[in-house]
Regions:
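N-terminal organellar transit peptides
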Residues: 1-17, 21-129
């Protein structure tokens, strides 16, 4: 219920994407990056269908959260996650500044001054209501 603004300054990796979009309005600096990738596994994994279903459930929850909090479609987000021609030895995509805005993940390119200005604007709007 409180006004919230996020600002991606450097690299927003892994859980940084859901954190960045969880705010009411989001910014990214022109050189900021967002790494979009599916849930990853480390260590020993039991190779049974239930393990796959569990990871799919986790991925669906994260994808649903991100899509509910920004303007990207589920299909576009999943396409970015499963891109194979961009990250070496991995799947996913790296979006830089304006690309994150153009895909609908982030609201606007801007720095700390724009983020603070937007927050002040949102606080002012709340006080009027």
């Amino acid at each position: 219920s409180k006004p919230t603004v996020s600002l991606v300054l450097g690299g927003s990796h892994s859980i940084g994407v859901p954190i960045a979009v969880s705010c009411k309005y989001s910014f990214i600096v022109p050189t900021g990056t967002m790494v979009i990738h599916p849930v990853r596994m480390n260590g020993m994994v039991i190779g049974v269908p239930q393990t796959f279903e569990y990871f799919k459930l986790i991925q669906d929850r994260i994808t649903g959260f991100v899509c509910r909090h920004c303007q990207i479609s589920r299909q576009k987000l999943e396409d970015l996650m499963m891109e194979t021609g961009f990250l070496t030895k991995d799947v996913g995509s790296i979006l830089v500044g304006e690309e994150a805005v153009n895909t609908g993940i982030i609201d606007e390119v801007g720095g700390i001054d724009r983020a603070i200005g937007k927050l002040r604007e949102m606080i002012g709007d709340d006080q009027v209501q």
